[in-house]
Amino acid sequence: MNKIEILKSIKDGLKIKEEITRFAKEGWKSISEDDIQRLKWFGLFLRNPTPGYFMQRVRIPNGISFSYQIKALCSIAKNFGNGIIDITTRQQVQLRNLKIEDVPEIFTIQEGVGITSIQTGLDNVRNIMGCPVAGLSSKEKVDGYSQVKALTKYISGNSEFSNLPRKLNIAITGCSDDCIHAETQDLALVPAVQELGGNTVYGFNILVGGKLGSGGYRIATPLDVFVIPEDVVKVCSEIILLFRDHGSREIRSKNRLAFLIEEWGEAKFRKALQEKLNDKLTPSGVDLRSNQKSEHIGIYRQKQSSLSYVGLKVPVGRIHADKLQDIALIAEKYGNGEIRFSHSNSLIIPNVPDQKLGGLLQEPLVKEFTYHPSSIMKGLVSCVGIDYCHLATIETKSRALQVAKELEDKLPDTESINMHWSGCPAGCGNHLVADIGLLGKKIKQGNEVVDAVDVFMGGRTGIDPKLATKVMEDVPCDELAKVLQHMVPYHTREKMHPIKGKKYKRNWKKASLAIPLEESSSSEKIKPRNQNIDIKPLSYNTEDTVKILNSKGWKKNSNGWLEKETSYH
C-alpha cells in the first residue's frame, strides 16, 4: 500500500478541517507530513518553492461566479496573499502565498459568499467543468450547468466520495462547441439526442477514461450510454463509486480511472454500471457536438434578446487582484455581476444589454484584456510553471508570453491556432490536445543547463479526437520563437484540419509537415517529422539534419521547403 493510501486509512481527509484552527495557532512547522497531504482535501497546498506559504485552489463549478465572490477573493489575495490570482484550465482560480495562520479567517470570508476550496486536491472529484457560456449560447442543446451544480452539491463534503484511488476530473456540457476537452476527462458528458418511446429526447452521451499526465496519456472512450438530465447525478455517482471500489490503489501513477477501463474494457465497465443501477442502460444517442472549437473570446449574441457576452483574454491566466476586482465592478455596471472563467485562461462578462455594450468596450481594462487579441494570443494557454509548482521544470507563463509576442510581431496575419504550454509531464496546460503543444524540460547546452521544450503538433478533442504527435525535441526556449515562426503558418488549425463544404475534414495525414531550411547554422539543426514516418522525434541538436531527412525521403522543394509525399490508404 502506498503512503497516501496509508494516511487515508488512518484518517479521512475531510476530517482535517477540525485541526485547522490548531494549525493556525501553532504555525505551519507544527503540521505533520501526513496532515500536509490531508490539507489538500480543502484545497491548501504547501509549495516547496515558497516554504511556509500555501496555495489555495478554489472550487468554481462550471467557472461561473459573481462579482461579490470575486471581490472577496481579490480581498483575500491582497490582504493575505501576494495579490496575484491565476485562472486555471479547470475554470477555477488559485490564490498564492497564504499563511496557515490566516486560513480560518479566509475560510470564514469565503463561506460568507458561498465559495469553498473543499476537495480540490488529491484523491477527490476536482472542480467540475462545463461550457463557460452555458445558458447563454444558442448552440446549447441541453442544460449542462444545472447538472454541474447538482453533482457538485452531491459530492462536496460527502465522505462517500472523499477516498478515491486517485483524482477524478469531470466535465459536463450541453453545448455543441468543443470547448471543455471532453476526451481528456476521466468522466465527461456531451450533448446527444436519442429516440425514446417514439419521442426525441435530449441528454448526454458518456465518455470515460481520459487522462493527461503521469502514467501515460489516454483519450476517453464512449461508454455507449445515453443519460437524460434527471439521471445525471445518479449515473455519475455510481461511476465514481465503481472507480472508488475497484480502481487500483497501488502505484500512484497507475491509479486513474483510465487504468480500470483498460483492465476491464468498456463492456465490462458498462455491465457493472448497469448492475449497480439495477436498470437497463440506454445506448448512446447521436453526438450533437460540431467540429468547431471556441475559446469564447470576443463579442457574442446571447440567446436572450438584446443581450451579449464579452469574452476577454487574460494572457496566460495571471491577473493582479486589483484589476480583477475592477473587472468585477465592470461586470456589475454593464452586466448583472456575473463573471465566468473559461478553460483557456480567460474570463467572460455576460448579460450585457445592447445599450451598454459601447460603454463596456471603452473601459480601459476591457482594452487591456482585449476581446479581440491576435490569433496567437487568443489560443495561448499555460500552466502555472516553476514559480509556484514544484513539479514544473521551467517557467512557463513568462516564456509563453515572450514567445507569443515575438510571433505576433513576425506573423501578424496568422490564422487561428492554439498553443499550449505544460511545465512538466502532468500536462496541466493540455499541450497534447493543442495545435502546437510545448512540454518544458531542462537540457544541457555546452556547459550550461537551459530551459527547453519538446514540440507537439496536431492535437485535438471533439468528435474526432487525437493526441498531438511529438515532432521535435530539446528546442531551447531562447530559440523557440525562431523555430515556431516557420511552423505556425503551415500548421494553423485550418491547415491541419481544412474545412471542405459543411464538414470539417481531418486530413492532417494528407499534408506534409513542411519546415523551411534557413541559411543560419541554428536552423540547420531543426528536425521536422511527418506524422506517419517511422522515426523517433528528431532532436533539435542532432547534426547532419538534411542528410538524415534525405535518407528518410524528405526533399527540398522549389520553394525551399522540406516536404515528403506519403501515400495513405
Model-inferred region functions:
Residues 1-508:
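Peripheral terminal and linker regions in Fe-S/redox and tRNA-modifying enzymes
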Residues 502, 506-569:
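Append "and occasionally in soluble cytosolic enzymes with long acidic Gly/Pro-rich linkers
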